[in-house]
C-alpha cells in the first residue's frame, strides 16, 4: 500500500471512530447501565450483585432503577387487573420466568432539585419526595483510565457515607448512579470508603423520546388497589427510619405481610427462632436519626 493510501485509510478510520462516538458525546438523552455490588448484612462476606442497574438521563430529569425490576412491574401491570386477578396469560408466563434482581428501589430526580424515592423489597413499598441537594465534591488532581475513558477522581461526604467517584468529561452530563451527581462529567464508577457499595459502568446507549420510561416509572409510585396495604408514604426521615426498622425486625415485617410466624423450619421438623441479621443500608440509619 502506498504512503498516500495508508494516510487515507487511517483518516477514514479516525472519522468513523468520531462518527460512532458522536451520538454519545452530544446526545441529551442517554441510558447507562451499571453493575451494582453491595454487602447486605453486617459480619458476613456475602456480596450481592445486580448487573442491570440503569440510569436514564433525559432533559431535566433522571431515573435510576433495575432493568429487571422495571420489566417485572411492567409485566405485572399487564398480567393482573386491579383486583389482582390474572387477565393476560402471556404476560403472566413471562413474569414467572423472569429472574429477579436484589435491588428493587426506584429513584427519580426532576429539574435537579426534587427527588422521588421508592424503597422496596418487592412486596413492601415505602416512598417519599424530598428536595434534592447534590453532593459537595472535592475534585482531585490527576487522570485515570477507566474502560477506555479518561476519568478524574472526586470525593464527598453524602447522606452518611464517604464516597469516591470517577467521572469523565468526555460525556458531558453531571448525572451518576443512585443519588450521586453534580460533577463536570458522567460518573462512571463510585464506591463508598468502606467498600460496602460499588457502582461500575458497563455500557451506554442513546435513547429516543419514544423510548422514555420516566412516566411509566412514575406510575409505579402509585399503589394499585390490590397492593395498597403494602404501600407507605411520608417524609424522607419517616420512610428511612421505617424501612430500617422493618428490614431489621423480622416479626414486624411478617406482621405487616400477614405471616403468623418468623420461625425457621429445621431439617428434623422442629421450629426455631430466626437468628437476627443486621442489614447494611446504603443510607445509614444514623443519618435519618440526625435529619
Label each region the model flagged.
Residues 154-217:
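Gly/Pro-enriched, hydrophobic low-complexity segments
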